[in-house]
Amino acid sequence: MAIKDIHNFKNHDRPKVLVVLGTTSAGKTSLGVQLAYELNGEIISADSRQVYKGMDIGTGKDLGEYKVNGRKIKYHLIDVVSPSQKFDLAKYQKMAQLAIKDILQRGKLPIIVGGTGLYIQALVDNYQLSSAKPDLKKRAQLEKLSVPELFNKLVELKPEFATRLNNSDKNNPRRLIRYLEVIGSGNLEIDQRRKSPYNFLLLGLNLPDKILKVKITKRIVDRLEKEAMVSEVKNLQKNGVSWQRLESFGLEYKFIGQYLQDKFDYVTMIDKLSTASYRFAKRQKTWFKRWEKQGVDINWIKDQDGALKIINKWLAKP
């Protein structure tokens, strides 16, 4: 099924930007790539772990999918930093905004694809994030606290912001410390919003829980048995990524890392990873529902045909 209106997407007062969001294993990449092919678009990843180099299997980069009928689909915000480097919401927003401008300047459609809600929200709601400089004295004090203690501090100071964090952010001490620094800096509010210069259309892939659970299980098995996920974690650790750092990335990296440290056996690792992945998907659904209650309009779809019907109406509007 073809898109009716192929045109230069920057020729609007508010240029159009498409978003494809959803839970883990929902099929976001496949749909996003197909839409990019149909719409002459490019993908901007909105995944807090896909920015890291060498973390391919566990983050589901699926780079082999970025090709349709022999044509490569260009992507952005994938493989941009080392796993040992710091990467936060402000950096993501800045890089993604530059990618949006670049894509539009070339007359193509930016398509944001991912499941990290806060990354997507920072773009759609146009957060004005703080540029506060690190407070080394305060940072030294915060580094003595555990992850739960850091998160509880954030809840006390900025509850609305804290509840929007994804699991990766909640378990990442570096990010929690940075958020606390920004909030305590007295500079810009961490989530001050400005009117967006873009016309966003948000599509959400919504799979029934039973189907999603089957897909999550299959993905875990495939990653472990066919895609050498354990070897990926071994290589990351061998190349200097600490066990603690791997654990902060959550899910596959956390549980495979613990398995490699002999904290439990292989079967237990799969069981723990499966349970954590199902819970993660539920939290993602809850996060998007909460965002809808705040006023965002997410068009929930089941497949590509449903997406194209909504997109055609969106493109027909000036």
Each predicted region: which residue ranges?
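Phosphate/pyrophosphate-binding catalytic cores of soluble transferases and nucleic-acid-acting enzymes
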Residues: 1-318
